[in-house]
Amino acid sequence: MNKLLILFLLLNAALTRQDNHASANNKPMLYNINSAPLYFEKFITQYNKQYKSEDEKKYRYNIFRHNIESINQKNSRNDSAVYKINRFADMPKNEIVIRHTGLASGELGLNFCETIVVDGPAQRQRPVSFDWRSMNKITSVKDQGMCGACWRFASLGALESQYAIKYDRLIDLSEQQLVDCDFVDMGCDGGLIHTAYEQIMKMGGVEQEFDYSYKAERQPCALKPHKFATGVRNCYRYVILNEERLEDLLRYVGPIAIAVDAVDLTDYYGGIVSFCENNGLNHAVLLVGYGVENNVPYWIIKNSWGSDYGEDGYVRVRRGVNSCGMINELASSAQVV
């Protein structure tokens, strides 16, 4: 066997052992920046990355190197969150926001949804932890791909849970229907959670995923009303002012689609994120539960970046500190017919 190939395989095995060490412990070993070229080649193979030219490859490598330096800084913090190289590692943060989030800014829609202010005293006797997944009311994690339509995954995720709560059955609803047939929101270029519900009300219902499958791009509307699986009876937009009251709302209403700033979450791998700033809301996700680990309270959030992201597609953020700007007026949920 070629000596260079043997050397590469040995180095790759060493890097793999380092990655395994990272996942086996609470805090990972820091990436060796001098090994960035090897990390990058492994990354290209693992995620089947293809670049149009050597210039683009160099450009992506420089971003990749910067991102692993940032990951090292995050992993040096005094919290339990772990960050690792993932499929976004060759992308600058603004590109990730453009391609893989999709929450619109400003007011859209007809505002059919009732507005509820989430504030005031919380219930005195509250369970320490709560998770809708344990009751089989959450559908599987999905992947929005390179389409800025997080708003539809979050809104339909909440609607799927409402259907499961009411009918004790999980169904996957069609995100593609909203991409193609919601003409108020902007398909793969952004939208709002509550306007998705308003548009489902206007359409008359929503089909199941297998009847109107996801393409991750806008196509001509092919609505089939006879295939509607359910619809929206009422929708609600929440002005969240109090996280303890949000706990009560989550337990009594069901999973809630919320808006966050996802920039600090792009390279998340596991643990509880304690440092997540809000420099502008850009992503919609589904709030499904909460808990406490090592005296640190946290929220459980379902993302739409596939099951290989984070903790099987989920992320935990610290509760009670407005993590990622989640205390805002863009949260929403709906009742199914």
From Swiss-Prot:
Q: What GO MF terms are annotated? A: cysteine-type peptidase activity
Disulfide topology: 147-188, 181-221, 276-324
Annotated catalytic residues: 150, 283, 303
Give the EC number(s) listed in the UniProt record.
3.4.22.50
Q: Which InterPro entries match?
A: Papain-like_cys_pep_sf, Pept_asp_AS, Pept_cys_AS, Pept_his_AS, Peptidase_C1A, Peptidase_C1A_C, Peptidase_C1A_papain-like, Prot_inhib_I29
Which keywords has UniProt assigned to this entry?
A: Disulfide bond, Hydrolase, Protease, Signal, Thiol protease, Zymogen
Reaction(s) the record says it catalyses:
Endopeptidase of broad specificity, hydrolyzing substrates of both cathepsin L and cathepsin B
Q: Which SUPFAM superfamilies match?
A: Cysteine proteinases
UniProt GO BP:
proteolysis
Spell out the residue numbers of the propeptide: 17-126
**Superkingdom as given in the UniProt entry:** Viruses
Modification note: Synthesized as an inactive proenzyme and activated by proteolytic removal of the inhibitory propeptide.
One Pfam match, given by its short name, reads Inhibitor_I29
The family this protein is said to belong to: Belongs to the peptidase C1 family.
Q: What does this protein do?
A: Cysteine protease that plays an essential role in host liquefaction to facilitate horizontal transmission of the virus. May participate in the degradation of foreign protein expressed by the baculovirus system.
Its name, as the record gives it, is Viral cathepsin
Q: Which gene encodes it?
A: VCATH
